[in-house]
């Protein structure tokens, strides 16, 4: 299941986002969206989890949680 994450702090790394979701199950991919020219974060990302049940549990657990000073906004993509 693909999960859309927004309101990411610009300093958050792929490995930090991965670490948050790994606590709730298997993660197959993590991507943080960046502007091509500047290479800076768009404050959004995608997390792919093979298990829908684990993905829904991760969304419920992480919705509104603080990560790097920003409150996460998460939904199914």
Residue spans of the language-model regions?
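Canonical RRM/RBD RNA-binding surface and closely related RRM-like beta-sheet modules
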Residues: 1-76
């Amino acid at each position: 299941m693909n999960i859309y994450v927004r309101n990411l702090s610009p300093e958050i790394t792929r490995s930090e986002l991965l670490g948050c979701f790994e606590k709730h199950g298997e993660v197959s991919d993590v991507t943080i969206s960046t502007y091509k020219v500047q290479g800076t974060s768009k404050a959004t990302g995608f997390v792919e989890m093979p298990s829908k049940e684990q993905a829904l549990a991760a969304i419920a657990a992480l919705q509104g949680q603080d990560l790097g000073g920003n409150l996460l906004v998460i939904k199914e993509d």
